[in-house]
C-alpha cells in the first residue's frame, strides 16, 4: 500500500495479526480506534511499531455499507483518528495549519465542492428519500436533536457519555418557544440497537423522527441542530444552520459551532471552507470502486450524484413484460437498488396485476423491450391504470455485439418514447429542447467527448482490423461513408418516414455525391449473420465495402457520413465529421447535421457538447459489469477501455458457443425478417 507512505522498494503486501511475524513489518494498519482494531493496536504497541488508522471517509456510498454498495472514500491517519479528540489526529493538524498550507486554489475547490454537495443533496450515505415534515407550530422554532447508537466509538472519542446526551436533550427542551424533534436511529426504535435518548425523549414529550430522510431535506425544515459528535452536525453547517456541539467532533472548537466542551489543542477560528478543505480534500482519499482507480472528490461527487439520480428515478415496483431469459439475468441491475422487479411472460396477466391506485400514488409500471413492444401496448397499459416504460440499448454498450448475447453496460429507459421514435418526443428530446446546460455540464460533456475520441470508442468496440489507406484508394476524390443498418430494427420503422433500406440509402448518397468515393459499411450484426440488411451488388452504387475494422478509425479518413438513423452518425458528429441524415435520429434537427427530413418539434440550435450532455450523461443508465451497481458514463468509458485492452492482448476472449451460433441463425431466419 504505497499510499500509506512506505519507501519505494519496500514490500508493502499486508500481513495480518495472527500470521507468522515478519521482520520487515514497518507499520500496523487497523480500522480506526474501534474494538475491531484492538488487537492491531496492541500488536503495534508491543512491537514498537507505528499504528495507522483507516476509516470510511465523509462521503462514502449510495447506500449503507450493510446494503453492499462499496465505499468510495477512506481516511488514513498516522497520529490518531478524526473522531477521537482525546489525542491529536492528522485532520486536527491539517485544520490547525490551514492558514499556512491551504492555497487559494484549494479553497476554491472547497467552495465549488460544497456547492455541488448542496446542489446534489449528497451526504455520507445517500439512500434516504426526501420527506415533508408536518408544518411548524405558529411562533415556534424547531430544533433537531441527534441521537447516536450506543456502540458509536465517536461518543467516547468525542469526550462524551450517556449523560452528555441527556443534558443536550434537557437543554433543548428548556428553551421557550421551541419544538424539539429527536432524530433516533431506526434500529433503536425497532429494538435492534441501543441509543441514548429514546426513553427520555418520550418522557419529555418530544417528537421522535425515526424514518430515513435526506439530511438536506431535514435541514430545510428545522431552525437549528444539536449534536454530540454526529457527522450530521457538520452537514448542517454546510447547509447554513446553527449547530450546538455537546461533544468534541472534528468540526468543533474552530469557532463554527456553539460548543459545550473545549479542546486545548484547538481554539483558533477557522472558516467552513478551511475545515471542509482539510477534511474532504486533504485528509480523505477517494477511489472509484468500479474502475479500481484513484479519484478526486469532484469525480466521486459526480459519480454519487449520477447513481442517486438514476436510482431515485427508477425506484419502486416494476413488471418486466416478455423479456427473454438472457435479459432477465441483468435487467434488474439497471433499475437500481431501490426497485423491485417481477417478470411476467403473458401481457394479459401483467395488465391484470395493474390494480387501481390510491389517489396520489404513482402509477404502477410495466417495462418492455422497445423493439418488441407492439404499437397498441401503451394504450392497453394506460387503460389498465399503469405506465409503460420502454428499454433499449444505450449508446456506449459493450465490447462485443448484442446479437452475440454480450451483456450491455448501458441501457436507456423511457416512459415517453424511445429516442429513435421520431413520431413523438422522447425524454431525451425533451431534455435537449428545454434544458439549458450549465457551464459545468458542458465542460463535463467536453471532457467525456474528448476522452471517447482519444480512446477511439464506439457503441460495440469489438473490431480492430487494420484499415486500408482510403485516401490512396480514393485518389483525391471526396470520401463518403454510408453506414448500413439492420433493416428490421425498430429504429428504421420509427425514425425513417422516407427511405428504409440500405440499398436506397446508398442510391441517395450516390445521387448527392456522384463523383465521390463511396464506402459502404454494413452493420456488424448483419456481417455476423445475425440480422438482415444485405445490399445488392449494383455497379456504381459504391466503390468499397468495409465489413471489418473499428468504425471510429474510419472517421479520421472520411469527408462525410450518410446514414438513415444510425448511432454512427452521432459518433461521427462528435468527431467533427459532417453528417447527412435521411431519417430522424435523436441527433438530427438541432442544427448540427444536414437533414433530408425536418422535425418541427426540434426548434433549438445546440452545441455538440450540449448534445453529448443529454445523450451520454443524462439519458442512459450505466451499470458496472462485475458488481451490477449503477455507475456513470466516465466509469463505463474506463471499463470499456480496459475490456478492449484485455481483448487485444488476449486476456479476454469473446468466444461464440454453439448456442450463440445457433441463435444467430435462428434470428436471421425468423426474428429479423418481420
Q: What does each model-found stretch correspond to?
A:
Residues 1-674:
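Catalytic-core helical/loop segments in enzymes performing group transfer/polymerization on anionic/lipid-linked
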